[in-house]
Amino acid sequence: MDTLRAGGAREGEPLVERLSTSSEVGFPGDWYALNSADHFWFDWRLRAAIRQWRACGLPLDRPLRVFDVGGGRGVLRDQVEAATAWTVDLVELNRAALDAAGPGRGRHLYYDVLDQRADLLGQYDAALMFDVIEHVERPRPLLDAVARHLRPEGWLLVNVPALQALFGAYDVAAGHFRRYDRASLGAELDGGRWRIDDQRYWGLSLVPLMAARKMLLRQATGETIHRSFGPFNGFVHRGLATLARVETALLPRAPIGSSVLLVARRCD
């Protein structure tokens, strides 16, 4: 195992552990540049997820061992560790993203879960796969590999973009193969390895905005992600952040939404 100090970090800063020899995964740089826990969308996603996890009985106050697959520069990891007692290992194949991640309670792993290292199999209580599987042409092998890293009855926590009718230039620019509904997301977990406990949409209020985005952005360009995801001016951002808080509080199960959250458990 190669242990590399992230981005030339000083003593005490996080280490990147290179566990795989897989080629680095490219990703639109604008996406990482816009990632921030302060961005209304990331805050909205976390609020919706925490509400779902509580409803499903996940023990937020216990020190679960969790791994965040495709966790980027650690925005979700930071949010989850701040909101729970969990220790989250950041798993990523984009070295620049790992270098940009700050310290957390867990490890920073340059690791392809398809490698299925023996020392990591069956070691985790839960896996986070937020906005990952839509980037994978064939998600089943990845999901099977993730399952093998979980303990029996371990949780799989997923978020994906919703409603194929909204698929447009933004999705192309972001590297999406598809958007999901509850049925198509559930179908990815067929095969007897998973028991789905809950699926729910969030972001109902964003659906008309994303429909407008699809109509306005006809072709993916180098500016598509930046134009679609911000940064927004202060007034617009505060309005969307308020909308997120209100919708999450009043509408825990939206009939449709811009994203779908899933909680499943390993049952094989």
Predicted regions and their residues:
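Short, glycine-/aromatic-enriched active-site segment of Class I SAM-dependent methyltransferases
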Residues: 30-36, 156-178, 182-188
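A SAM-dependent methyltransferase catalytic signature shared across enzymes that methylate proteins
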Residues: 186-200
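A structural helix-start
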Residues: 136-140, 160
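A short glycine-rich, Lys/Arg-flanked "PGG" loop and its adjoining helix->strand segment in the class I
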Residues: 140-155
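Conserved catalytic loop of SAM-dependent methyltransferase domains
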Residues: 28-31, 75-76, 198-241, 257-259
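Conserved N-terminal segment of class I S-adenosyl-L-methionine
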Residues: 1-130, 140-143, 227-234, 247, ...
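A short His-aromatic
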Residues: 131-135
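Feature marks short, surface-exposed loop/turn motifs that line or immediately flank catalytic pockets
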Residues: 97, 164-166, 205
